[in-house]
Amino acid sequence: MDFRTLAKRIIMTLLALLILPYLLIPVYALPFIRPVSTLMLADLVTLQGYDRRWVPLEDISPRLVQSVMMSEDGQFCFHGGVDWNQMQSVVSNALDGASTRGASTIPMQTAKNLFLWNGRSFLRKGLELPLAIAADFVWSKKRMMEIYLNVAEWGPGIYGIEAAAQHHFKIPAAKLSSRQAALLAVSLPNPIDRVASKPGRGLQRLAGLIERRARASGGYVGCVLD
């Protein structure tokens, strides 16, 4: 095989990998499809296995939905996949040399979980943004939340809220209390180091804040809990 043929095959493979997620997004809109994340696939390939028990949105405690939205994406019901105001603020702070916090919305996190890889990079973010916009356009907000809560990582080999609720609190996701829901929500950014069932003082304080915000969430969660 000459260099030109090899280069052509590599380019075609990369193009196929770039296009594939956009073909899967409308497929994942179908309610009977249960997507898996790239981390789950990695666990399978490395023979580690994982625990994920898919549950429909109606079988998940509304307290958990409220807590996750208030912790991860308070504008979920109002943006089209990307919170451009928050994104602009993060970019401005970065250019000024100030510390920044993430601007990843729930659609962006879902796109990353389903199609991309962990770790911060401009390349991943550049791929993530259009995928989030496409998914938010094709899926309903309820479907987006259902997929997100069923593929999110909540510990080593623990994926989805049902497996998380059973692993950390020995109860189904439908029966999570306000505090349990808040603890699971605030552990999402770093589920390996933040253990919902063994929270330190800092995690307890953060969970208390999210618990209060969840109680007052009102119209902020209407697109999912109407």
UniProtKB/Swiss-Prot annotation:
Its main location: membrane. It is found in: Cell inner membrane. Keywords: Cell inner membrane, Cell membrane, Cell shape, Cell wall biogenesis/degradation, Glycosyltransferase, Membrane, Peptidoglycan synthesis, Transferase, Transmembrane, Transmembrane helix. GO terms for molecular function: pentosyltransferase activity; peptidoglycan glycosyltransferase activity. It comes from the Bacteria. Its EC number is 2.4.99.28. It is a single-pass membrane protein. It catalyses: [GlcNAc-(1->4)-Mur2Ac(oyl-L-Ala-gamma-D-Glu-L-Lys-D-Ala-D-Ala)](n)-di-trans,octa-cis-undecaprenyl diphosphate + beta-D-GlcNAc-(1->4)-Mur2Ac(oyl-L-Ala-gamma-D-Glu-L-Lys-D-Ala-D-Ala)-di-trans,octa-cis-undecaprenyl diphosphate = [GlcNAc-(1->4)-Mur2Ac(oyl-L-Ala-gamma-D-Glu-L-Lys-D-Ala-D-Ala)](n+1)-di-trans,octa-cis-undecaprenyl diphosphate + di-trans,octa-cis-undecaprenyl diphosphate + H(+). It is an enzyme of class 2 (transferase). The keyword Protein biosynthesis does not apply. SUPFAM superfamilies: Lysozyme-like. GO terms for cellular component: peptidoglycan-based cell wall; plasma membrane. GO terms for biological process: cell wall organization; peptidoglycan biosynthetic process; regulation of cell shape. Pathway: Cell wall biogenesis; peptidoglycan biosynthesis. InterPro entries: Glyco_trans_51 (IPR001264), Lysozyme-like_dom_sf (IPR023346), PBP_transglycosylase (IPR036950), Pep_trsgly (IPR011812). The chain crosses the membrane at residues 10-30. Peptidoglycan polymerase that catalyzes glycan chain elongation from lipid-linked precursors. Belongs to the glycosyltransferase 51 family. This is Biosynthetic peptidoglycan transglycosylase.
